[in-house]
Design a protein with these regions (language model features):
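Short, surface-exposed ligand- or partner-binding patches at beta-edge/loop junctions that are enriched
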Residues: 93-94
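Rhodanese-like catalytic fold shared by cysteine-dependent sulfurtransferases
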Residues: 1-39, 48-90, 101-148
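Structural scaffold elements adjacent to functional motifs in cytosolic proteins
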Residues: 42-44
């Protein structure tokens, strides 16, 4: 599917969900847009601990939206975003399962970015056994990631 078609689908999904930003992408759609839309950035808003111990997406911009430990909002989030990401290009936000990235997309949209949330996040929802990484998410979709 062409990038424009993917973004139209994401925008329609976002309207259906009542989202106050550009739209919502599946992990596979996000990967397609990130790789093929000029200037698009994937911003991983998980914590440093998650990047270090759970895994990273090679080439993603990493900006914590909450700090670890403590889980407090990162007061420098928007300043860091503005220093690393051009407002003229699509910005795709991802976290563990979609909640923090939704908040990041809302903040970015308020600041003038064309923002999208990556549904399911990096790890996806829990399966019947209570484990992540098997039901939805970037990793379960077989998209690029690494672990230290």
């Amino acid at each position: 599917m062409a990038v424009d078609d993917v973004l139209k689908t994401a925008a329609a999904r976002g309207r259906q969900m009542g989202l106050p930003y550009g739209g919502a992408l599946t992990p596979a759609e996000a990967h397609e847009v990130w790789r093929n839309a000029p200037g698009a950035k994937l911003v991983d808003v998980r914590t440093r601990a998650e990047w270090d111990y759970v895994g990273r997406i090679p080439g993603a911009v990493e900006i914590e939206i909450v700090t670890y430990p403590g889980g407090r909002p990162n007061p420098g989030f928007m300043a860091e975003l503005e220093s690393k990401v051009d407002k003229a290009a699509p910005v795709l936000f991802i976290c563990r399962s979609g909640g923090r990235s939704h908040n990041a997309a809302m903040l970015a949209a308020q600041a003038g970015y064309t923002a999208y949330n990556v549904l399911e996040g990096f790890e996806g929802d829990r399966d019947a056994g209570g484990h992540r990484n098997t039901v939805g998410g970037w990793r379960a979709a077989g998209l690029p990631w690494s672990q230290s």
